[in-house]
Structure formats: C-alpha cells, structure tokens
C-alpha cells in the first residue's frame, strides 16, 4: 500500500507579456511516492542519469532545506513533464519538495506559506504558484513579499508544441537585456496590464492579441526559437486565440477555445512534424496529496 503520494502539475509562465508574473497550471504531472524509511535518501526514477538519486536530487534537497531535521526515506518519482522545455519541470520539483517536507515533517504549512517558500527558491512566483494553486495565477515578488491572485479560465483549451531540443533557462535568460529603455518598459507594462484585465474578464480574443505583443522577452529569444512566428501564424489561421513562448522556451504555448483544442492540435501536428504537439488542459486543482496509511516518523 502506498503510504503517501504527491502530485504536482506542470506549468507555463509569462503567457506573453506577463513576464515572471503570469502562470497557468497544465495537465502534465510529477508524481512522488514515499516508499519507506531508510538510513539515507534514495530517489528511484527512470530519468536521465544526470538526475541525482540521492539527497542532491532537487526534490530532496528542497525538502531538507525546508525541514533540516527530516528523516531520510526512499521515494519514487515519475513524471511526464518534459525537462528543460519551458513547462515548469524544476518548479514542480521544488513544489513537490516543499510538500514532502510539509507532510513528513508535520509542518502544517498554509498555502500562502508554500507559495512564499517556493517563490524564494525559484526566484519568481509564476510557475510555482500555478503548480500549487492550479488555474491561472498572477503574482508579484517585491523583495521578500509575494502577492498572488488566482483566477479561473475553464473556457480555455491549451496546446503545447514541444521540440526535441532542450533549452536551459540560464541560456535563455542570457539573451535578455540588462537594461530596458523607459519608454519600452511603459509600453510593455501597458500590454501586460491589458492581458491581466482580459484574463479576469474572460475576453479571450483580447488575451490572444496581448499574448502576441510582448516586449519584455520574446523579441530577444526569437533567435533561440525561430519557429515561433510561423507557428503563431498557423495557429491563428486554425482558430487559436494566441500563441507565446512557454516560459523561457523552447516549447510553444497556445490558447484555444476549449471545444476547438483537438481540431487545432491535429492541424498543427500535420504542419509541424518535427515537434511533439500535445493537446492539454488547464489543471484547476494544483498540488494534491494522497495518504493511504500513516507514515512512521
């Protein structure tokens, strides 16, 4: 019998101009199952050999930072979230680690505390808040203070186009400018403001328009994801609301009318054969914990 299992959804961040602020939880998942107590941490997984199987694993190292006195366990980790593709794989691991510490250490963390801790680890709230809360989130980090608002977007469908190539977040951030001209910042901020207002009022056509008018990061990352303009053009012709980079890339994130998501995904798959086209849904639940028997502490 499984004593404890944790499920964390993937996420997409930015949604165009909502840079490091807007996130959406997606229906791809990281699962952590606690097996038994051990004399040292062991992580069972079938990922690449570069992913640690001891206390250096991101899930375990996060848990131990949150609760340094945590006893070691054997855990099993499975996931269908692609690594280093802009779908929040590291954020999901951080969120899983915080919940692992919360459960095994009996910390009784509130949701707000989990979001605060996760944001401190990740450096921005968009991915982690989406994975914790589910749905669409808008967040801000000001010094050490995190503010997050969650909204529902059940009328939306999601398509992700995932390339075979990885793109490290640090590499993707390295192409961004160190200094942003004031007039460009004003323009970019205004577009982001309209995006958020449109999300709240469910004006999906406006959401799609604003998604495609980012000034903060996409113009600088186009050299790393050259297919974005052609994917954006085709998606719009097929009936999508809007297309943007998923997080730092290289995956592409498309919002569609919910009832058209399958049709649009099939059309895109016929055109962009070198990419994996995934018809997804917005996860509205966020992190879930399943306890089937008491854990020996």
From Swiss-Prot:
GO terms for molecular function: ATP binding; homoserine kinase activity. This is Homoserine kinase. The gene is thrB. GO terms for cellular component: cytoplasm. The keyword Nucleotide-binding applies. Pathway: Amino-acid biosynthesis; L-threonine biosynthesis; L-threonine from L-aspartate: step 4/5. Coiled coil: none annotated. It is found in: Cytoplasm. Its EC number is 2.7.1.39.
């Amino acid at each position: 019998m499984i004593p404890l299992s944790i499920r964390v959804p993937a996420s997409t961040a930015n949604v165009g101009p909502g840079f490091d602020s807007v996130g959406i939880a997606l229906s791809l998942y990281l699962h952590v199952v606690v097996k038994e107590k051990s004399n040292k941490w062991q992580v069972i997984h079938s990922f690449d050999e570069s992913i640690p199987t001891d206390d250096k694993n991101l899930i375990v190292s996060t848990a131990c930072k949150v609760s340094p006195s945590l006893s070691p366990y054997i855990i099993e980790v499975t996931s269908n979230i692609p690594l280093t593709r802009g779908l929040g794989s590291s954020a999901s691991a951080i969120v899983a680690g915080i919940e692992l510490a919360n459960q095994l250490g009996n910390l009784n963390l509130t949701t707000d505390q989990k979001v605060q801790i996760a944001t401190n680890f990740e450096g921005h709230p968009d991915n982690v808040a989406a994975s914790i809360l589910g749905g669409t989130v808008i967040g801000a980090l000001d010094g050490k203070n995190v503010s997050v608002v969650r909204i529902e977007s059940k009328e939306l469908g999601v398509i992700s186009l995932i390339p075979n190539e990885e793109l490290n977040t640090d590499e993707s951030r390295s192409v961004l400018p160190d200094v942003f001209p004031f007039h460009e910042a004003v323009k970019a901020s205004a577009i982001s403001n309209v995006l958020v207002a449109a999300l709240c009022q469910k004006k999906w056509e406006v959401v799609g328009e604003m998604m495609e008018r980012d000034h903060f990061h996409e113009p600088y990352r186009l050299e790393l994801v050259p297919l974005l303009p052609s994917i954006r053009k085709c998606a719009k012709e097929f009936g999508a609301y809007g297309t943007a980079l998923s997080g730092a890339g290289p995956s592409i994130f498309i919002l569609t009318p919910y009832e058209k998501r399958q049709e649009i995904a099939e059309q895109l798959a016929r055109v962009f054969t070198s990419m994996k086209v995934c018809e997804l849904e917005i996860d509205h639940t966020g992190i879930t914990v399943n306890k089937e028997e008491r854990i020996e502490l």
